[in-house]
Amino acid sequence: MPVICVNPSNSSDKEIVDGLSEQNEDLRLFLSDELEDSFKSSLPGKKAIGDILDDTHISTATSGAFCGVFFEDKDAKLRSIFINAIEDSSLKRIIWLSQSDPDEKILNLKNLAYLQHEDYKNLIENVLELESQEEIDFGHKQISKD
């Protein structure tokens, strides 16, 4: 099933994208036009590049994907943009990756698994498992360091 990664923007995000690329033949990316060209070209998958601050760009890019993996920035500036994009999308599964606590608006989104992590520890395994399963448990999951 097609998966789209929204806002991968650092080397740890790239590791997750690389893992998803190995297990999913139809990997898509929505990347900020502010990212370095060398980083954008290092990522696998079909790329859409646009304004990460425009939720309509993101929701349009998710069209046709089954699963969306949203990489939230450390200071959660994109939170409301992601929420609007998800609400306007047809995604059947959303995996939201964040170091911040979720709020009620996020947890009330349908079909959402919220993975809260500390410095990406043990995150990749959890993302790959959730993306590959036919059925998953939705809601908030704290990823421990051990």
What annotation goes with each model-predicted range?
Residues I106-K145:
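Conserved beta-loop-beta element that borders a ligand/cofactor-binding pocket
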Residues M1-L29:
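N-terminal Rossmann NAD(P)H-binding glycine-rich loop of SDR-like oxidoreductase domains
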